[in-house]
Amino acid sequence: MQRLLFPPLRALKGRQYLPLLAPRAAPRAQCDCIRRPLRPGQYSTISEVALQSGRGTVSLPSKAAERVVGRWLLVCSGTVAGAVILGGVTRLTESGLSMVDWHLIKEMKPPTSQEEWEAEFQRYQQFPEFKILNHDMTLTEFKFIWYMEYSHRMWGRLVGLVYILPAAYFWRKGWLSRGMKGRVLALCGLVCFQGLLGWYMVKSGLEEKSDSHDIPRVSQYRLAAHLGSALVLYCASLWTSLSLLLPPHKLPETHQLLQLRRFAHGTAGLVFLTALSGAFVAGLDAGLVYNSFPKMGESWIPEDLFTFSPILRNVFENPTMVQFDHRILGITSVTAITVLYFLSRRIPLPRRTKMAAVTLLALAYTQVGLGISTLLMYVPTPLAATHQSGSLALLTGALWLMNELRRVPK
């Protein structure tokens, strides 16, 4: 294989190859490759591929490993997006509390016989959701919500495999640089943390409340933590993937570009915060409190914004305040994206960067339309799930534009 890929060393003895075969390595400042001996067939870091010959080491810069790792992380971010969307549908169909225990391996086999299904249904009947909300549920209806939660859990395990197995392979092959190894370890650790956090969230909905008539639901705080960590995992994977796959633009570091870059970062943070506030809306069913727009009922600012004491509790526990906050954050986000778009038009930017700005603007107004429609139609499941998927698409657009504007290290 080495003979096919590279000419024999005798053929390299010509005048034009003398610098390559010189006994002393070129200074590091004058070449982009690093010379060091490797085992035959082993790749070095993601920025080089080296082959060892009998008379020395020949290192050639290569982007092949970068592309492989970048595509892998792009697939990883896609699986995380699928988990977020499936989790949202599970929440909207009120299926999240149907599986009342958690086992990493044992629960991967679903019930198959009538006796197993009856036993599973009897376990569910011991918890508040059945006693208060679903006391007239049939076994057929229970199977539907059980399979919804089962699908979400199995998808989560798939996400873990998609991260961990290729990461181990790339590590063994030596395709990860030192910095990339740290990132990959952090991503894999966050995946494992996500699984534990998901069960911690579900447990909050299985506990008996102090008031026996309280509607069984998971803690909105734990739901927001579960969604937030998933979004962090998605953003980190997607950002790293884009950085590896998309060649950076060498833009002139002007004052206008610096302002645009900072504004893009702030806008992306605002989009993230708006998506996170949606977890509180879902956790408290706040989308059903006021189903009118732009006013909330008959007024712009409803009277029941500050019904809880202390006042700070209203931000996270009062459904009216939670919906109000989500509206304000959504309007602020689309306004910031609009301003960002017009700022980008004042600077000569590459075509791909302009496309990212236009895409982000289109996604923003589509998401606003979906949100208003979901509100006015009393949160139908298909539309609400599309709205949640739109938040991921909008966050993706913001990350893409940020990546296009990133500073190129000198």
From Swiss-Prot:
Protein name: Heme A synthase COX15
InterPro entries listed in its UniProt record: COX15/CtaA_fam (IPR003780), HemeA_Synthase_type2 (IPR023754), Peptidase_S1_PA (IPR009003)
Recorded domain comment: The N-half (TM1-TM4) and C-half (TM5-TM8) domains are connected by an intracellular loop. Each domain is formed from four-helix bundles and they align in a pseudo twofold symmetry manner. The N-half domain is the substrate heme O binding domain and the C-half domain is the cofactor heme B binding domain.
Localization per record: Mitochondrion inner membrane
Mitochondrial matrix membrane side: 1-67, 172-183, 248-268, 345-356, 403-410
UniProt-recorded Gene Ontology molecular function terms: heme binding; metal ion binding; oxidoreductase activity, acting on NAD(P)H, heme protein as acceptor; oxidoreductase activity, acting on the CH-CH group of donors
Entry's family note: Belongs to the COX15/CtaA family. Type 2 subfamily.
The protein's Enzyme Commission number: 1.17.99.9
Pfam families per the UniProt record, alphabetical: COX15-CtaA
